[in-house]
Amino acid sequence: MNTSVTEYKKAYESMYAICEANGWGDPFSYARSKEILMAGTLNHQVSITLAGADAIDEDGEAEYKSTTGKTIGGAYNGISVQKTWEEQERYLTEDKIGKYTNHYFARFDGGKIAEIWKMKGEVVLSILLPKLRKKFDTVLSQKDPRLGASVSKTEIYNYGEKIL
């Protein structure tokens, strides 16, 4: 094994051991390592589960979105579809997006956080509900029958609060 691979293996195993010791779960599952780094940067508590909230902030459970793209944004994909729009709106408001008081959006550049923005859950809902409503009636006929929509850079800059 060459030196670079040996160093990588050591760092990988070390990261995993740190996360295991703290009850943070697998740092290499989905964007978990980014969530752990965001929580540490924001002085939030890392969520102990991979389902539901990503972290706990001063207001309770929080949602994190991150990107490695050139511009910040937040994708809300893979949302379960309910039978009616009324049920869907209730689900989004009470069980999914609106459940979290604060949503945090981060853009990573290389291995570092380039920027973090905070947005209230009700603002995120006001942005996403019209986008999701447009897709609702036809989503079940799609190849992937789940809802998804994004909060754009412009929306984050206009309605969010810059943290970093």
Where are these regions (language model features)?
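Nucleic-acid endonuclease domains
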Residues: 1-164
